[in-house]
Amino acid sequence: MTPHTKEKLHGDLPSASSKAASADRKELAAIAFERTRMPMVVTDGRKPDLPIVLANKAFLELTGYPAQEVLGRNCRFLQGPATSPIAVAEIRAAIAGEREVSVEILNYKKSGEQFWNRLHLSPVHGDDGKILYFFGSQIDMTEYRRIEALEASEHRLLMEVDHRSKNVLAIVDSIVRLSNADDPALYAAAIQHRVQALARAHTLLAARGWTNISLEELIRQQVTPFAATRAIFNGPDINMPAPVVQPLALVLHELAVNAAHHGALAVAQGRLSISWKPRPSGAGFYIRWQEVGAPTPPKLAKRGFGTVIVGAMVEKQLKGRLQKIWSDEGLLIDIEIPSAGPTCA
């Protein structure tokens, strides 16, 4: 509704006189205002605080206020702690300029419940162009907002699933490419065991909601089946980001398999000690894998495929560092893992 324009209803009502028709039209307009399902209010634009002078049934039902608690008050009683000051300022500017405005604003019902309100405010001017009233209609957008948020959440979930799937596929691709294919039966068994290690890690991730994964829990999960009571675990509570878990699970699996077949766990007197600690920066962690009593490999021993996979997971997937040292006591492996997750490239 523009200034200096007096809106009229289109059409006419049959009546014995123009005066009666005018009265009928006013009565019909009042009935329509009251019975429409759209919440509506009218405020007095000539008074200082723009008090509400009319409020229909739909408005009272939406807000939960009785008529006596609405009439005579400014509409700001619907505002609350989380109402946007920007939206409020936009409404005030439109009132000051006597112009139409549509604003989506967070309002509060009498019960304290929040609802999203799409407010359309229109000025009503007299024949002389002066402001008489402001007419406000509302649409409850709460359910729409809820659905919108669900759709956004679903989209984020799909993106996260896509990202996680790419990470897992990258790891599986590494397993397939780096496993020894000389003997088909051994090749199939090695891949199966490595994928099972990933599956156990995935189960742990799912159980923890893909957040706050305990480093100790992962280490014990992957190592205990091979070490039983012959492993010592020592370190503080450290939680890992989810992208680190599956590549690290494969690293631990390979180290445990090697220890069981060729290292300290392959001999009666051998012992395995695994310790961990946070990096000085607080981001990421160190793992020390120590095998005491492990047989020293021949100097010209061929680099095993498990070693290749461990190196690929630590250095390429996790962007970490690995150092292996043989001594008279046995094998010492130091692993450094930064906080960032793996890449899929």
Curated annotation (Swiss-Prot):
Residues 99-153 form the PAC domain. The keyword Nucleotide-binding applies. Changing C75A: Lack of activity. Disruption phenotype: Mutant produces similar amounts of exopolysaccharides and shows no significant differences in the biofilm biomass between light and dark conditions. Mutant also forms a higher number of white nodules compared with the wild-type, independently of the illumination conditions. GO terms for molecular function: ATP binding; photoreceptor activity; protein histidine kinase activity. It catalyses: ATP + protein L-histidine = ADP + protein N-phospho-L-histidine. Disulfide bonds: none annotated. The modification Phosphohistidine is found at H163. InterPro entries: HATPase_C_sf, PAC, PAS, PAS-assoc_C, PAS-like_dom_sf, Sig_transdc_His_kinase_HWE. Keywords: ATP-binding, Chromophore, Flavoprotein, FMN, Kinase, Nucleotide-binding, Phosphoprotein, Photoreceptor protein, Plasmid, Receptor, Sensory transduction, Transferase. Pfam families: HWE_HK, PAS_9. Residues 25-98 form the PAS domain. This is Blue-light-activated histidine kinase. It comes from Rhizobium johnstonii (strain DSM 114642 / LMG 32736 / 3841).
